[in-house]
From Swiss-Prot:
This is Sericin 1. The glue-like property of sericin is attributed to the hydrogen bonding between serine residues of sericin with serine residues in the fibroin structural components of silk fiber. Sequence repeats lie at residues 593-630, 631-668, 669-706, 707-744, 745-782, 783-820, 821-858, 859-896, 897-934, 935-972, 973-1010. Keywords: Repeat, Secreted, Signal, Silk protein.
Amino acid sequence: MRFVLCCTLIALAALSVKAFGHHPGNRDTVEVKNRKYNAASSESSYLNKDNDSISAGAHRAKSVEQSQDKSKYTSGPEGVSYSGRSQNYKDSKQAYADYHSDPNGGSASAGQSRDSSLRERNVHYVSDGEAVAASSDARDENRSAQQNAQANWNADGSYGVSADRSGSASSRRRQANYYSDKDITAASKDDSRADSSRRSNAYYNRDSDGSESAGLSDRSASSSKNDNVFVYRTKDSIGGQAKSSRSSHSQESDAYYNSSPDGSYNAGTRDSSISNKKKASSTIYADKDQIRAANDRSSSKQLKQSSAQISSGPEGTSVSSKDRQYSNDKRSKSDAYVGRDGTVAYSNKDSEKTSRQSNTNYADQNSVRSDSAASDQTSKSYDRGYSDKNIVAHSSGSRGSQNQKSSSYRADKDGFSSSTNTEKSKFSSSNSVVETSDGASASRESSAEDTKSSNSNVQSDEKSASQSSSSRSSQESASYSSSSSSSTLSEDSSEVDIDLGNLGWWWNSDNKVQRAAGGATKSGASSSTQATTVSGADDSADSYTWWWNPRRSSSSSSSASSSSSGSNVGGSSQSSGSSTSGSNARGHLGTVSSTGSTSNTDSSSKSAGSRTSGGSSTYGYSSSHRGGSVSSTGSSSNTDSSTKNAGSSTSGGSSTYGYSSSHRGGSVSSTGSSSNTDSSTKSAGSSTSGGSSTYGYSSRHRGGRVSSTGSSSTTDASSNSVGSSTSGGSSTYGYSSNSRDGSVSSTGSSSNTDSNSNSAGSSTSGGSSTYGYSSNSRDGSVSSTGSSSNTDSNSNSAGSSTSGGSSTYGYSSNSRDGSVSSTGSSSNTDASTDLTGSSTSGGSSTYGYSSDSRDGSVSSTGSSSNTDASTDLAGSSTSGGSSTYGYSSDCGDGSVSSTGSSSNTDASTDLAGSSTSGGSSTYGYSSDSRDGSVSSTGSSSNTDASTDLAGSSTSGGSSTYGYSSNSRDGSVSSTGSSSNTDASTDLTGSSTSGGSSTYGYSSSNRDGSVLATGSSSNTDASTTEESTTSAGSSTEGYSSSSHDGSVTSTDGSSTSGGASSSSASTAKSDAASSEDGFWWWNRRKSGSGHKSATVQSSTTDKTSTDSASSTDSTSSTSGASTTTSGSSSTSGGSSTSDASSTSSSVSRSHHSGVNRLLHKPGQGKICLCFENIFDIPYHLRKNIGV
């Protein structure tokens, strides 16, 4: 090791050669030796040299330090080599060095170790002249660490490097490798830690063809994580994949992307979670011609499954979706297709729901038993649509069946007992088909089957009185209507085919006569005062009107009223309703308004009677028109009063349809209202009334909106005997597909009230369901609101009440700048007095889905309120309110939706008075929003029932405000509903007042609309003294500087029904007025706009056995651009002797419509409608050749 010592020895050897000279015969050989010894150390060295080689060595030892050094050097023809060793036994140190070289290369190595610290290091180097290899290693036993490194340089220019480090103390190991030549590069890195059970590695490869690949993975056993990423690239394509899993949460996710040389690509994601039982996957594939995407989701926890697919190619775009929910056994699927040029489109929607339900109650204290079972409640519905350049076809249908059984038994210690058994079986089916081309056809089918059986028994030992009743009814109905129309125009024909029946004639400026196919009107009534049966009151009214190619506007109004009265003898009365159809095809800047009103009144006194009356249906169609609007309003009012004997009343509801396809800048508004009132006194009666259904459809429209509103109100009051009341709910559907800058708003409201006094009764009422769908909509919004209110009041006897809830669904897929808002509200109230009662009420469920939405928001609110109060003394007051606020952040072009619901119920009996008041206020604000919407809904329901003493006062109101400023392509929708019911019996008077006010404001909006709807319903039933009922509804809608917009204000429907018997007199008045007709003429900066106002009022009062009744009803409507029709029907009947009265009134406003049409600026064609050919003015008849 001591190079200085070696050099010294070599120098001494050279000097000795010169000093001593050459020995004879051995002149090229030199040998030198040196030795030195003492007690502490010893040294020795030598040098040998001959002609070709030299060798030298040295050795040194120290006994005190316990160390020694050795070195050896050799040089000759084979090369040069050197080795050295050093040892220190005292400190346990060792070191070595070796070196060798020859003509072909060489090698070297060195190392040291320390046994005291257990450390060791080594270095190696080898070369063969072309290739070089080097390595090093280190070891530390104290820290359990080890380190290795290696490098290679090859003759071809390639090289590689690797390193390895490990430490048992930190339980960590790291490895790195790198290799490169002129074509290939590879690198990898690996890191593992045993203490945290974690391992990660990464790699990179580049091949000779230029392709690259890289990846990394991370695994952790402690946190149960595993992540992997892989990417690759070639000269033609790229791709990648990422996987992640967490076994602690039982989660897995996967994403991939691949592209092909032809430019196509596919990508997808997969997610699954076993902990919350969810799975989701999405795939997308695209090439130069088409793109396909699919989305699948499932939740085994919520028992839900959904899938959606979209495909877009050169021919067009198709969309399909499927939903399945196993918890309530519900299925739905939809398909839609739109051609690339927009000429061919179709859509299919199917839904199915099955539910089973049973309930059993038992109480030992009062021996109360009640059980009910509803099984196999199945409903199916479908919707089909098709359109091309020439044809617009639409068909829809629904099918439902229901079986229901209920029974109750009650007894107390005083001997009073009552039992009730009811069985129901329902079946219904409906179908609707619309087809439009050069001709048009519309057909509607419906079938209904209703079977009911009820048995009631009451016994009381205290009064030794017993009463039993049994009733069974079976009802079947089927209806079918079909209409078709075609129009033929001839330029030079001078002969006109004329049918002198009840036909309408149209006159235009080109002196052409077009025939409008119409129906006949038939009415008949018969009454008898003899001791025989009164039957045969059959009233019907049908009218159809069709228009073709109108340039400006058209209006149709039809009204039918039928009355039948039979007195003093048992009788039956049947009356059918009225149907009105209006169709408009290819109208520019036109307006279609269709209004149908039906009023039926039946009064039978002092004997048993049964009555069945059909509802009212209204259709309005519009296709391919620009800048126009379609408004259709249907109203049905049915009233049945039977006194002093058993009677049953069944009345059908009201259905309204509005269709619009391929229109720009327009609006579709349809409103259906149904009101049914049944009053039976002093004997057993049953009342069944159907609900109200409203449909609104819109496809491929820009800048427009679809609004549909359905309202159903049913009231049954029976006194002094057993009665049962069943009422159906309200369903509303709104569909919108591929709409831009549009909105879909649908509102359904159902209110049912049943009041039974002094005997056992049962009430069952269905809920309300609302659906709103929107797919592929941009800058649109979907808003759906369902409200259901059910009230049952039983006094002095046993009763059971069961009411269904409310369900609301809103779906939105692939929407940009859109929003989904769904609101469900359910309120159920049961008040039974003097005896134990049971109340069962369903809740409220709300669903909102949004997928792949940008800058959107989803808001869903559900509210359910149930109250049961049974009292024997004093009074109770209950009041509650609900306020709800919804916020959305980080959304641009979004929406704010807030919903409030308040329900208050008070029931007091036998003493004192009670006062209940409740209100609901809801506010939604949106400022500076683009393509957004503000939707706010308030609902208030108040119910008061007081019996036998004093007076009660109930007042409730609902106020709703919605503001939107500086919104483009937006909409403001606000809806207020107020329902108040008061039932007081046997003493004094009661006063009930309720109102609803709704405000909607919109300023500086383009393609927007303002919609405000108010509905108020008040019902009062008193047996003695006087009762006063007043109801009002006020609605205001404002719009300024709107283009292609529409303002619709509907002062909905106001219904007041009163029934009083046994004494005194009753006076009722109801008035509804709307004054906004001339606003049309005062508007500025409005293009293709429309405002429609419709008021309907129906008032009916029945008084029997004594005194007189007076009824007053007024309706005033002033509206402008198109004909606005108001229909008022008033029927009053009082029977104290053998007398019968029948009244029928039909009013149409012809001349007012004619005047407005004549004075409207820019009118291209004038349309006049006449019932009889002789009503045509002489100069007109002369011009058309009549």
